[in-house]
A protein has these predicted regions:
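Polar low-complexity intrinsically disordered regions
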Residues: 1-9, 217, 251-253
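N-terminal auxiliary segments of SAM/dcSAM-dependent transferases
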Residues: 2-37
Length: 253
């Protein structure tokens, strides 16, 4: 029998370093929970656990907690169209399309600068593919945006998921270009805002401290007061979408 697990319990106190020095935190306290969630998120990223996750057979590369929160958002918001930049293997597209299939409405537009042949084949042969349209091109190019707009009717509600190039400048450009598609009450979700948290990780980069999607979101919110962070979708604590669920408020609200 593992004595640590089934016999003597490990110490419930852990030490953390703060600006004021070292302090002990009870792991069962709210403060301790926040510390453990932060450590788990960072270690999870370094060990690439999100790469172990699939949705209906397709790799999705997202935290299970974020998948649950996105599911909840789609069910509550029920957009007519979801636009995603950053197709990768296509798992997220299949997630959105399968939820829309259950809801009996809606479709998904996936945008990527390069959609590899085997990924396209996996997506287009999937049972959820009838609700998916793929557009190959840079998400910030005018021609790509025109192709996206041409597939959206004027009266349709739109949700946007940004998960492509994660530099500050690119994400900011995406936010500026795709925000007009989202009406009052609609959402933009920005992924991979974990980057500044893992800038010091073995697989991270020091430049991520400033060059990351979270910085782009802060820049965008400073100039677009009609959008706000909906922190209710971060309540599971472990997330790659810190301040990433952006809700467009009603005009003059």
């Amino acid at each position: 029998m593992n004595e640590t697990t089934h016999g003597t319990q490990p110490d419930r106190l852990t030490k953390i370093k703060t600006a004021e020095g070292e302090k002990e935190v009870d792991i069962y306290s709210p403060e301790g929970f926040a510390v453990v969630a932060n450590l788990w998120t960072r270690s999870n990223w370094q060990n690439k656990l999100s790469y172990e996750v699939t949705w209906l057979g397709i790799p999705i590369i997202q935290l299970p907690e974020d998948i649950l929160m996105v599911q909840e958002l789609i069910y509550k918001n029920r957009p007519d169209v979801i636009v995603e930049s950053g197709v990768a293997h296509g798992g997220a597209l299949v997630l959105y399309a399968s939820l829309m299939e259950l809801l009996g409405r809606g479709r998904v537009i996936g945008v990527d600068i390069e959609i590899r042949k085997y990924n396209r084949l996996a997506i287009e042969s999937h049972p959820a593919s009838r609700r998916i349209t793929l557009i190959e091109g840079s998400s910030t190019d005018a021609s790509t945006l025109d192709a996206v707009r041409s597939r959206i009717q004027p009266n349709e509600s739109v949700m946007v998921m940004l998960d492509s190039n994660h530099t500050r400048d690119h994400v900011r450009a995406e936010l500026d270009r795709y925000a007009p598609l989202v009406g009052p009450g609609g959402y933009i979700v920005v992924f991979d805002e974990v980057m500044p948290m893992v800038a010091d990780a073995p697989n991270g980069k020091p430049t991520w401290d400033a060059d990351n999607p979270l910085s782009a979101v802060r820049d965008f919110l400073a100039k677009n007061p009609d959008f706000e962070v909906d922190a209710s979708y971060e309540r599971l604590a472990t997330t790659y979408c810190h301040s990433g669920f952006l809700r467009r408020m009603a005009t003059n609200s």
